[in-house]
Amino acid sequence: MDLGRVVSRTGHEYSSAPHREIPVELRKLQDDVAYWVTHGTFPPDEIAVRFHHRLVLIHPFPSGNGRLSRLMGDLLAISLGQDPFTWGADSLKENGRQQYLDAVRAADKGDLKVLIALARVP
């Protein structure tokens, strides 16, 4: 994915798909998820978390991408016969938000283990 640069409200810089490539990247994501599900490439939770993470990276909207991506990840998990994720539950309200952002950044670097684990924290 050819990534653009965006600076968040908190001053953190992150990469996202350039605006003109968002539809293409969303289609690639749809195709990848269909392949993963059809071929059992990953366990259901990992498929849903990978989907969530890629959607965050694509960043299709000016704001609300994290919330939308978590909701979409939950819906995918449910469609795969899993319970919705907790995403750290109540901890997201306080210091857990930083844990979530750190887990997303680790996933940005290829380490999805922390984000997968956080998704199921009660």
Positions of predicted regions on the chain:
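FIC/Doc superfamily catalytic core
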Residues: M1-P122
